[in-house]
Amino acid sequence: MKNIYNLFRIASRIRSQRLKLLGIYFLHMTRQRYLGVFIDPILACNFRCRMCYFSDGEKRKTLKGSLAFQDIEAISKSLYHRALKLQIGCGAEPTLYKDLYKVVALGKQYKVPYISLTTNGNILTYESLYKLVATGLDELTLS
């Protein structure tokens, strides 16, 4: 995964938006992977951290629901073949999603080279960690 971070480093040094767009166009035309897909399969959290928007009762009322697995399959069909990285959990708690293992497996099915999960880790067990890694998780970030 060192190559992914090298690409990110190179892209951050390029100042010209036109040159970046040309690079993306080149990657697209040569059928390379260039997207970072960030997904929150569920809008819920089991913590109420002060710095987080889930601690605000009014805001939390608007943050409800989860994606049906069929919706995630539709997203994956459209984007995963171009994804360089799949980030699961961008602000909510992905371990509350009942089909989390299927989401990771779906990323591997589409050969996404790097799959990362960000979680507070509260409900993770040894068995769930083992299953996530066995399904194809590359990185686990505890926040």
Language model regions located:
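Conserved alpha-helical substructure of the radical SAM core
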Residues: 2-140
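A short, structured active-site edge motif that brings together acidic residues
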Residues: 143
